[in-house]
Amino acid sequence: MAELNVEIVAVDRKIWSGAGTFLFTRTTVGEIGILPNHIPLVAQLVDDAMVRVERDGDKDLRIAVDGGFMSVTDAGVSILAESAEFESEIDEAVARQDSESDDPRTAARGRARLRAVGAID
């Protein structure tokens, strides 16, 4: 099966780099799925985005992303985020509490984290 190179980087660290067969996320213009050989594009991610990377023969990666941009080129997909967390790094109870915050940024971050752990769509 064809693969695409994916690199996810946050301001403070490189999150993940590897091969995937499909990438799904939410942008400011809607949900988008990226397959190998996708046309080039640049998109702004929503503040409560979750990135899912499907991998051939491996478990899907689910990463909560706080804002940022996605670039798709012939070389693959690059996501540059303000912050990002793997599903395994997220405390669901804390994420749920954050999602109910009066602060819009904190609430968005909480929703992204809940999406990453599969608690909400």
Curated annotation (Swiss-Prot):
Q: Name one Pfam family in it.
A: ATP-synt_DE_N
Q: State if Cell membrane is listed as a keyword.
A: yes
What InterPro entries does the record point to?
Answer: ATP_synth_F1_dsu/esu (IPR001469), ATP_synth_F1_dsu/esu_N (IPR020546), ATPsynth_dsu/esu_N (IPR036771)
Instruction: Report membrane topology.
Output: Peripheral membrane protein
Provide the protein's localization: Cell membrane
Query: Mind listing the UniProt keywords for this protein, alphabetically?
Result: ATP synthesis, Cell membrane, CF(1), Hydrogen ion transport, Ion transport, Membrane, Transport
Q: Cite the GO molecular-function annotations of the record.
A: ATP binding; proton-transporting ATP synthase activity, rotational mechanism
Q: Does the keyword Phosphoprotein apply?
A: no
Q: Name one GO cellular component term.
A: plasma membrane
Primary role: Produces ATP from ADP in the presence of a proton gradient across the membrane.
Query: What is said about its interaction partners and assembly?
Result: F-type ATPases have 2 components, CF(1) - the catalytic core - and CF(0) - the membrane proton channel. CF(1) has five subunits: alpha(3), beta(3), gamma(1), delta(1), epsilon(1). CF(0) has three main subunits: a, b and c.
HAMAP family to which the protein is assigned, alphabetical: ATP_synth_epsil_bac (MF_00530)
- Record PANTHER family: ATP SYNTHASE DELTA/EPSILON CHAIN, ATP SYNTHASE EPSILON CHAIN, CHLOROPLASTIC
Tell me the protein family, please.
Belongs to the ATPase epsilon chain family.
What is this protein's record name?
Answer: ATP synthase epsilon chain
Organism from which the protein derives = Mycobacterium marinum (strain ATCC BAA-535 / M)
Its organism's taxonomic lineage begins at:
Bacteria, Bacillati, Actinomycetota, Actinomycetes, Mycobacteriales
**Annotated gene:** atpC
